[in-house]
Amino acid sequence: MSLYTVGVEEEYLLLDPATRLPMPAAEQVRAAAGLEPIAGEDEIQPELSEAQVEVATPVCTSLDEIGGHLVRLRHVLGRAAESNGCRLAACGTPPIKEESPPPLTNNPRYRAMRAQAPQLVAEQLVCGTHVHVGVPDPEIGVAVLNRIRLWLPVLVAMSANSPFWAGHDTGFASWRTVIFGRWPVSGPPPHFADLADHEKRVQQLLTCGVIFDPGQLYWQARLSSRYPTVEVRCLDVQLRADDAVMFAGIVRALVATAINDAKAGVPVPSCPPELLQGANWHAARHGLSGSLIDYEGRRRSAGDVLSQLMDHIGPALDAADDSREVASLVHRLLREGTPADRQRRALLRGGLRAVTDLIITESAVT
């Protein structure tokens, strides 16, 4: 089994340490971080809002590399944020926010998005983790999408880290998933007949003007328009860097398993789009706190579905020598709950102040 390359992008909020509101200081933080000798110029990037920043690891071959880069980048950004009077926050949505959004980053594409959908952009203050896995060619990439799409609701549930919005509990474990689902091309990707079918359908979306560039394909998994990768985008950003490492290992193993199954002629399990969409909504609503709906439409315990996932990707994890690390982190997740669960426990202890204390503390790398 080939060892596929992997890279991770993480988006963070910047919070005012006094008010805990999103703080529009991205330009200053990025400038300060760029002065650090251990941060590359392309590794720290702007995001839609001036209260957000994004980091991108180099292309890696091991989870140790991914973890080292994420810790390094969180450390650099954390120092830069503190030097500019704010704090780094690895949460999918801001627990507290003002009615008016932070300023938009000065970028022509972002301005075009605001003109296209003003209210959606105003509420797009969300942060995710994106995992890129290298694939040999786009045709194989489409075959991968057809197979991993069935597992995206499980990843949504596992990564849930956005229960609060504008000072209240949304009732969802991943409110970020709901926010992203309002865009015209979003949620789990459809099944494609082949690469030509994929290209035809994307071109139709561009031609009719529903999207104005491939970057607006907000499917939860897609072919990257910039890199020779499959990009999984359904994950909320993680409180802890090692949980992002866990997801990098899981996603790479899903891609490797999909490639091997496609080459072996293993049939793609069927799943009606409405069932997959419903399973995705259910995962965003409940996280791992109860049941999940699998791609056969069965309501099962979250633990059983995670066990099925680990069995499915087990050989790929073994081949990459990732089994022990990923299994240990999955067991911790089941024991402690999702970041959304942990945020809610903090709320019971000390209100929203305790929630943001948890987020700031866990996001920091000391």
Curated annotation (Swiss-Prot):
For this protein, the record's Gene3D superfamilies field holds: 3.30.590.20
Q: Which domain of life is it from?
A: Bacteria
Q: Which reaction does it catalyse?
A: L-cysteine + L-glutamate + ATP = gamma-L-glutamyl-L-cysteine + ADP + phosphate + H(+)
Q: What is a GO molecular function of this protein?
A: glutamate-cysteine ligase activity
Note the Pfam families from the entry: GCS2
Q: What is its EC number?
A: 6.3.2.2
Any one Gene Ontology BP term = modified amino acid biosynthetic process
Annotated SUPFAM superfamilies? Glutamine synthetase/guanido kinase
Q: Which UniProt keywords apply?
A: ATP-binding, Ligase, Nucleotide-binding
Q: What's this protein's function?
A: ATP-dependent carboxylate-amine ligase which exhibits weak glutamate--cysteine ligase activity.
Against HAMAP family, the record matches this protein to: Glu_cys_ligase_2 (MF_01609)
NCBIfam families per UniProt: gshA_cyan_rel, PRK13517.1-1
State the family named in the UniProt similarity comment for this chain: Belongs to the glutamate--cysteine ligase type 2 family. YbdK subfamily.
Name of the featured protein: Putative glutamate--cysteine ligase 2-2
